[in-house]
A protein has these predicted regions:
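Conserved phosphate-binding/catalytic region of the ribokinase-like
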Residues: 122-123, 174, 178-290
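Conserved beta-alpha-beta core of the PfkB/ribokinase-like small-molecule kinase fold
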Residues: 99, 105-184, 202-203
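Short, conserved phosphate/pyrophosphate- and ester-handling motifs at nucleotide-, phospho-/glycolipid
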Residues: 13, 165, 231
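Conserved N-terminal subdomain of the carbohydrate kinase-like
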Residues: 19-104, 279-290
Length: 290
């Protein structure tokens, strides 16, 4: 199955009718060839997916479950993506970028990928591109919790919109309270204008720099099959709504909706909707975007 946080978002954004480009590096091996073919079949651009003849394609093993959270095992250390260097990212064209979605997973892969991530962040900031950032904490990849916390919070300073989870907030700044989490990130950087905190089935808390925060309730799911991909679904819901000039309330509601649809399927991104499926879901729930 094709997956991975950033790619999940790209697939879901594409499925909702928007153009996406994925930035990564694959090995010159059968797994890399299969992955690139699948990425293209999902309609995601691969202009900036490069091939590495010397290193292998990273992968993940995921336990198949009938409900809840599966165990996952990452095999990415030493992979082609872990060798993606900053100079390669100079070839990434930013002119047509409307929103750049960044995740805290890639900089955890290696020192090389960490520097590449910083370089791309700096380029995006210099080009004044809107950056969404999902901390996507993976302690097993960092192997150093203090460094993970320090660097994820530093990366967040470059983001316009930050999408942490409530549990991530507890690790990153010591509180599970959505308002405390939002205040922390709004106060640490003038660039950050919006923080949307994922609070699980309860929904999401939205806070801007110049207005009172508010909750956007989640949708009830009677049968949770697999939770992997729900957070990425939330991110792509927010991103696509903003691309369509929807309000922040609608963006959070769409994020909640996509997350709810995703947890009802076994794959990492199988539940991400088309526009028609999203419309049908809203109609069944008796809600609409503004």
């Amino acid at each position: 199955l094709l997956g991975g946080a950033e790619l999940n978002v790209a697939i879901g954004v594409q499925r909702l009718g928007h153009t996406t480009e994925y930035v990564s590096r694959l090995g010159a091996d059968p797994l890399g060839g299969y992955a690139k073919k699948q990425i293209l079949e999902h309609g995601v651009g691969t202009t900036f997916v490069t091939e590495d003849a010397d290193n292998w394609t990273g992968f993940q093993l995921k336990q198949m479950v009938t409900t809840g959270d599966p165990q996952t095992f990452n095999y990415r250390t030493g992979s082609a993506a872990a060798h993606l260097s900053a100079d390669v990212l100079d070839d990434v064209k930013l002119d047509d970028v409307k929103i750049a979605h960044m995740s805290g997973i890639f900089p955890a892969l290696s020192e090389t990928s960490n520097q590449a991530f910083r370089h791309l962040m700096d380029r995006l900031v210099a080009a004044d591109k809107l950056i969404t950032f999902d901390p996507n904490l993976r302690p097993a990849l960092w192997n150093d919790d203090e460094r993970m916390i320090r660097e994820i919070n530093e990366f967040a300073k470059s983001a316009d919109i930050i999408l942490p989870g409530m549990n991530e907030g507890k690790i990153l700044m010591g509180s599970e309270d959505p308002k405390d989490i939002a205040d922390f990130y709004l106060n640490q950087s003038d660039r950050t204008k919006v923080v949307i905190v994922k609070v699980g089935p309860a929904g999401a808390y939205v806070q801007t720099r110049d207005a009172e925060g508010f909750m956007v309730p989640g949708f009830k799911v009677n049968n949770v099959v697999d939770t992997v991909g729900a957070g990425d679904g939330f991110a792509l819901g927010v991103i696509t709504a903003l691309l369509e000039d929807k309000s922040l309330r609608s963006a959070a509601m769409r994020g909640n909706a996509v997350g709810a649809l995703q947890v009802q399927t076994p794959g990492d991104n199988d539940g991400y909707p088309t526009p028609a499926k999203l419309k049908a879901f809203y109609e069944a729930e008796g809600v609409s975007e503004d």
